[in-house]
Curated annotation (Swiss-Prot):
Residues involved in S-adenosyl-L-methionine binding: R81, G105, D128, D175, L176, N177, E201
GO molecular function term, any single one: protein C-terminal leucine carboxyl O-methyltransferase activity
Protein name: Leucine carboxyl methyltransferase 1
Native organism: Saccharomyces cerevisiae (strain ATCC 204508 / S288c) (Baker's yeast)
Keywords, comma-separated and alphabetical: Methyltransferase, S-adenosyl-L-methionine, Transferase
Activity regulation, per record: Inhibited by S-adenosyl-L-homocysteine.
Class in the EC hierarchy, top level: transferase
SS bond partners: none
Length: 328
């Protein structure tokens, strides 16, 4: 199952690279990137892909092929997912001088690179299955631009449970379904009193209900002040809504993969109810975010990149993905 779920990270990586190659990302305004960081953002992601080829030609081939065949509607989705999460992170970082980020199920995500350069008091922890972080560790150390940006040595010198333990950045292996292992790891790499951002980006949808709820409850009780940012698909709650059923069928047929809670938390309200212990919970679908949070000047920029004639398809897709922010 770990290996199957890791394949979904390659999907996310190919989508991110496709959006970058066409110019959807980076969004220097919404991601608050300087000219220099915008240039580095592109270089970091391209270097990650090139270096991936050294360790897995098969994975590189899949990512490269998918990247080149991405449609505008997919690029819009990746753009919204990325800037939506980044905007939530940035809002919390600006409001709190010292912050730690815990990225659950980090995969190949490189969000830590610009954030660590932008915020000198930020600490960042990436956590995922062993196989995923082993590959990420190898790529980060092998690529010169990635290695230098994180201040790493080419040799792996970190001590268990970390693969990377370098200043303000840590990379660690953990099965997040095992709450004992997860708690033990957080005990050694985070501090309770520091304001904490928890990111779960397409993670909880692959976990069973009991395990995911225990993870949420345990982590929220562990930190005195925090912001949980979660991005996931929802199955849809309208009588004639077939989105969730079709998604489940496609995943089962193509990957033998399940999303156990896709239909359990099939609406924004049901999804957000998992964070009922938090006093401040905001949940939006990505279509709402597109219409309410993306300024017209930015939408004009997006329209100049590619012609999008599947506006109704974009609406259907993005109303079935949500961004939830729970603050306590």
């Amino acid at each position: 199952m770990e290996r199957i779920i890791q394949q979904t990270d390659y999907d996310a990586l190919s989508c991110k690279l496709a959006a970058i190659s066409v110019g959807y990302l980076p969004s220097s305004g919404l991601q608050r990137l300087s000219v220099d960081l915008s240039k580095k953002y592109t270089e970091w992601h391209r270097s990650y892909l090139i270096t991936l080829k050294k360790f897995s030609r098969r994975a590189f081939g899949k990512v490269d092929k998918a990247m080149r065949s991405s449609f505008p509607v997919m690029n819009y989705g990746t753009y919204l997912r990325t800037v939506g999460i980044d905007a939530a992170i940035l809002e919390f970082l600006v409001a709190n001088e010292k912050v730690q980020v815990v990225n659950l199920g980090c995969g190949s995500d490189l969000r830590m690179l610009p954030l660590l350069q932008m915020f000198p008091h930020l600490a960042y922890v990436d956590i995922d299955y062993n196989e995923s972080v082993e590959l990420k560790n190898s790529i980060l150390r092998e690529s010169e631009i990635l290695r230098i940006s994180l201040g790493l040595s080419k040799e792996d010198t970190a001590k268990s449970p970390f693969l990377i333990d370098q200043g303000r950045y840590k990379l660690a292996a953990c099965d997040l379904n095992d709450i004992t292992e997860t708690t033990r790891l957080l005990d050694v790499c985070t501090k309770r009193e520091i304001p904490t951002i928890v990111i779960s980006e397409c993670l909880l949808c692959y976990m069973h209900n009991n395990e995911s709820q225990l993870l949420i409850n345990t982590i929220m009780s562990k930190f005195s002040h925090g912001l949980w940012i979660s991005y996931d698909p929802i199955g849809g709650s309208q009588p004639n809504d077939r989105f969730g059923a079709i998604m489940q069928s496609n995943l089962k047929e193509s990957r033998n993969l399940e999303m156990p809670t896709l239909m359990t938390y099939n609406s924004k309200e049901k999804y957000a109810s998992r964070w009922s212990a938090a006093p401040n919970v905001i949940v939006n679908d990505m279509w709402e975010i597109f219409n309410a949070q993306i300024p017209e000047s930015e939408r004009k920029r997006l329209r100049s990149l590619q012609f999008l004639d599947e506006l109704e398809e974009l609406k259907v897709m993005q109303t079935h993905y949500i961004l939830m922010k729970a603050q306590w």
